[in-house]
A protein has these predicted regions:
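Charged catalytic carboxylate motif
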Residues: 24, 97, 101
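Conserved N-terminal glycine/acidic-rich loop preference
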Residues: 84-85, 105
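C-terminal alpha-helix
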Residues: 101-116
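Short, charged juxtamembrane terminal tails flanking transmembrane helices
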Residues: 117-121
Length: 121
């Protein structure tokens, strides 16, 4: 599995703020580190800030500390995603607050890729 990332210059690990998922993300990041991949970042999916405030979910700051990796995006929990999946409708077509979130994260990924290409020239 490590050989499959050898041509990559970056990796984005997507996880959820659940203990088992953070454990799996840490193992994945460790494998990517052993493949000498330097640019590793994380996207946190299904994040519920209300649960974080009630200490029922791991915070994004704790995730950053546990994974020793920067978070480039946090996607809030939104039940409309489940409804869209069950109906076969793209999330971007639903009346959801996630459209701008996905646009911001994808823009950040694209711009950081452009910055990396510019630095290599």
């Amino acid at each position: 599995p490590i050989f499959s990332v050898s041509p990559a210059d970056r990796a984005i690990v997507v996880t959820t703020p659940h203990v088992s998922a953070i454990h799996d993300a840490r193992r994945c990041i460790s494998l990517l580190d052993s493949a000498h991949l330097d640019d590793i970042s994380v996207i946190v999916n299904a994040y519920d800030k209300h649960m974080v405030r009630r200490h029922q979910m791991i915070s994004d700051n704790d995730i950053t500390a546990l994974l020793s990796t920067r978070i480039i995006g946090t996607i809030p929990y939104d039940k409309s995603v489940i409804i869209c999946q069950n109906r076969g409708i793209p999330v971007r077509e639903a009346k959801s607050r996630l459209g701008p979130v996905f646009a911001r994260i994808s823009g950040q990924i694209i711009h950081s890729s452009d910055d990396m290409r510019g630095a290599a020239v």
